[in-house]
Every structure is written in structure tokens, then in C-alpha cells.
Amino acid sequence: MAKNLASRYPWVTKPFIVSAPMRIMSGPALAVAVSGAGGLGFIGTGAKTQDSMADLREASISVRKSQVFSTLSSDDSVLPIGVGFQLWSDDVEIAADAIKELRPCAAWLFAPRNGQKDLDNWSLKIRIASPQTQIWIQIGTLAEAKQLLRSSELPDVIVVQGSESGGHGRAKDGLGLISLFPEVADLAQGSQIPLFAAGGIADGRGAAAALCLGASGIVMETRFLAASETRISRGYQNEVVRADDGAVNTTRTLLYNHLRGTFGWPEEYMPRTIINKSYIEQQAGTSFEDLKKLHDEAQKVGGNGWGPGGRLATYAGASVGLVHGVKDAAAIIQEVQEATQRIIGGVSQNV
């Protein structure tokens, strides 16, 4: 599997680090920076599918101009950038047309409304559009993994997301990565499909633990919220750096989706967010109408809309207490890779 990954993603260095396709925030600058530093950067879905495709086109231009990717710039190569889709809201025809034109190296599929049927449909249409584009599918339960591995459209990579993750994860049936991953790995044994670990990983310690569980690579989301290239409000980013104790200060709730006017997510999913006054007051009995009015007012005050006294959505994972500052994506990757190698080396001396 390691040899296969190396041939598919020849610019990637070890350990294999991925920046997740965070909605809107994972723009072309972050994706190109991550891939340019030896990882694999994904562009996140936009407000509509066309937005993601515009980002992918911008990333393609940046890659062609970059000396880092000069050896990959032939007409036969795929774009060293991935793109993510939320299947319940994205348009597969628009996505397939753009993938055919721009040939990203990977397409990350997540959150189908109709389960495996939607995943199969998207996988087939993307493969027809661009046979070289690898299909990455995110799952968060053993049941999803079982359905996926019985499919006629097997993915090229499975991303196993633990319940510690930020953004939208399983609403009620999620499980921590350290228990979920080995069970999925046992199920997938013999399939030769690489498994990537996601959820709660923000430094070399988490990455090393995931590799010891058998992961071929690791995915970080919350850590990259504090990358300088991330498309994010300064107030939001400052709150990610400030917050600690993810067990106490984050929760899964649909409140912030609804305050922002986002409805329609499949019922299996619910986002994790840093708690602030909106959630606290909801729990105390404040009506949604009043919370909505206060939320909309907070949108007008800039960076002060975030923080413990703020009211705006701050989607982030339980690992938020491990994020201590804003750095360039390249520095984050180097730091995590070096720490992982050091920790793995130390562990090998103790067994």
C-alpha cells in the first residue's frame, strides 16, 4: 500500500499528512501550500459547487506557476491537489465536468443523503470523467465501512473519522478514533485499500498514535484552521488558538447551523463547535428567535463576534487545546512530521 500511495502522490513526504476539505475555509492557497510542503491539500466545498470549481481552477494556475511542482507539470499529470464534496448539497454533474477539465489527484466524498447509493453514483461519474482521480470516502462508523466494502465502486482510500473531529461528524453513533480505527482496519484487511485516520490529531503525538493503529496517513482539520493560508476570519482563528479543554469547551449541536441559515444536512450528521454565549443561552432556555437576533447583531462587530462572549459559529475539533499559534502550512507539516518520526523512533526503543 505504501508503494501504491507513493506512486500516486510522488510529491508527498512521510508521514503522509492531509489537510481536510473544510467548507469554504480550505481554499486554493491552503491546498497548494500543503501539497507544496510534502502533504496533500484538499479544497473544501463552497457555498455552491461552482465555487469549489473556481477554487480548483485558481489552484491549478498556482501549481503551474510554482517551481515546487515543476516535475509534475506535464500534460499527462494530475493536479497535485484534491477537492472535497458534501454529496447532499453538491451537484455531481457540475463536479464531474470540472474534474474532467482540471483533473485533481483526488476527490473526497462525504455526507450522502442516500447512503451508499449516492457514494456509488458519485464515484462512477468521477471515474468516467477522470480515471486518474482517486476516490477518497470518509466514514465514521463500522456500519458505513461494511456497506462501503461491499460496494461495486470501491474507493481508493478510506478516511476513518473519529468522533473527536471538528466540523460535521456523526450526530449520535460516532466513536473515538482509537477504538473505531482498529475495528475498521480488521474489517478492511485484505482489501488493500489504504486507511487514513482523522479526528483529534493536531500534533506529532496524535499522528504517531494513528500510525501505530495502522493508518497509512493522517488527516488534520482543526490544526489547519490556524494556518496562515486558511481562508478564515481573524476572530475565528484567534478563538481556535485561545480555546482549550475540548472535552468541556466543544460540543456537537445544530444550533450554529440554524443561526447561520444552514438547513438540510442529513440527520446522521452534526457539527462540533466551540461553545459560546449562543449555546449557553440556548441551554438556559432562550428562544431561537432571540438567539438569532443576537447572532445577527454579532455578525456586525467583526472579530468580537467570536470568543467566550461571542455568538458566532466556531466549528473546531476536540483537539483544539493542542493548537497554540498560527503558522504557515509548511511549518505545521514539518513540525508534525519531525515530531512523529522522533516519537516513533523513541517508541521502537521501548518495545
Residue ranges: model-predicted function:
Residues 2-191:
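Active-site entrance/lid segments in N-terminal catalytic domains of soluble metabolic enzymes
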